[in-house]
Every structure is written in structure tokens, then in C-alpha cells.
Swiss-Prot record:
GO terms for cellular component: cytosol. It comes from Mycolicibacterium vanbaalenii (strain DSM 7251 / JCM 13017 / BCRC 16820 / KCTC 9966 / NRRL B-24157 / PYR-1). The gene is folD. This is Bifunctional protein FolD. It catalyses: (6R)-5,10-methylene-5,6,7,8-tetrahydrofolate + NADP(+) = (6R)-5,10-methenyltetrahydrofolate + NADPH; (6R)-5,10-methenyltetrahydrofolate + H2O = (6R)-10-formyltetrahydrofolate + H(+). Belongs to the tetrahydrofolate dehydrogenase/cyclohydrolase family.
Amino acid sequence: MMRVGAITLDGKATRDEIFVDLKERVTALTAAGRTPGLGTVLVGDDPGSQAYVRGKHADCAKVGIESIRRDLPADISQETLLETLDELNANPACTGYIVQLPLPKHLNENAALERIDPGKDADGLHPMNLGRLVLNEPAALPCTPRGIVHLLRRYQVEIAGAHVVVIGRGVTVGRPLGLLLTRRSENATVTLCHTATRHLPQITREADIIIAAAGVPHMVTAEMVRPGAAVVDVGVSRDEAGKLVGDVHPDVWEVAGHVSPNPGGVGPLTRAFLLTNVVERAEALAGS
């Protein structure tokens, strides 16, 4: 009922297409004795983080990537965590790996991320790889921004010349997404906004594409959207009843031309491009 008019940007169907391609590429790598391996480092027993990690390894099984898990207690020291990362850096079976965030408060997240071998940075969030993105040099790309761009292209949403309003300034989505969209291969014009931006509805009504990644429940409403615009819902938070919701209000479906559901939109592609980063590195190593 709420989705009258808008075309669904279906992340699950798009992910499945990517997985078919990845499975063929992993089969070829395995035949050459170069099976990719994805490592995960999980600290503590947060149910959400555990579920995310389980999902990533289930994805690995679907395409033939080896799983390497390092599950650590919540009270682990910074030194022991860094030793675990050093071990994965040196492990030839580990093509790439991620540190599941957030870490417990007594641990230094930035120090952990910087300890990852940039070549094994499956999330594309190492400072060196983010710097390469700024310089437009080849490197692993952040998974969620890459997934957003792929999803828009898959449904033929015009990016070149488009005015894109990104709401959210986090390092995992907002900041790197602006860098991706302004490359010559995308050629979008990006306005980066956040929860303290003045006159936000006025800005979003001028957008061809809105990316909502602020983590504020239902902050983007129909009144903020130009008819026919594409709206991508990335934010995840809980409403007053404790239910997981996105940043986009359901009434947006009645106005927009394209909308990504949440869940089922960008999330599946974040995981798909995590595996893609690992497979691409395995192919590069095999080629060298």
C-alpha cells in the first residue's frame, strides 16, 4: 500500500546477481590454488555483532570463500587485540579481513583499524585506503558507498550530472560516498548534510538523489522529497518502541521515483562488496 508509484531498489536481488559472478570467479581462483579467505575479528558477545559476523561467513560459504574467525573475549587487552591483527596480517590464507565494530569502550578503534595491513583491508576503511580514494588511486573501496553506487546503476538511476544530497557525515558512508560520487566516472554534484544542517528540507527538495545515512528514525519525509527523486535509506536505528527502522518515512514511497527498502536495500550490498573486495585482491595476487 505504501509503495505506490516508487520503483523498489532491490538490494537482495542485486546481491544475488553479484554472488553468481563471485562464485564463478572464486571457482577459477580455487582451481588455480588461490582460494580467497575472509577473516573476521569479533570482540565480545554483542548479539548484533555476532549476527553480522555469522551472516558474513554464511555469504562466504555461498560463493566458496574460506572463513577465518577470530572471536575474542570482551575484556581482551589492546595489546592482545593488536597481536591478533598481526597474526592475520601474516597469515597467507587470509586474503582480507575486517574488525567488527563497535569495539568495547576500553579498546582504541582507530589504533586497531590502522594496524590492519592496508592490502588486507576488506572494509576499505584503513586511513591509507581512504587517502587513496581521495587521490583517486586504486584501493579497496568502502563497501556501503560502493554498494549504493552499484544499486543506483543497476536500476538505471542517472548519476552523471545529478544533484545528490547525502545526509550523514560518518566515515563508513557519508564522507567516502561523497568522494565516490564526485569521481569522473560518476560525475555527480554532492551536497553533504547532517543533523545540524540548516534548512535541510529546502536542500533535499532540490535533489535528484537523496542518501539518508544519519541514523535518525524516519527523518526524511515526503515533504522533503521532489516528486520522482531517488531515495536510498541507509540509516539504522530504533524507534520509541524499540523496533529497527530506517531514516526514510514510509510516506516517501508515494512521492519518490525509486526507493530502497530498509532492510533489504543497501545492507545486502554492503556484505556483497565485502566479498568482492576480497575476491578482487585474490585475483590481483594471482595475477602478480
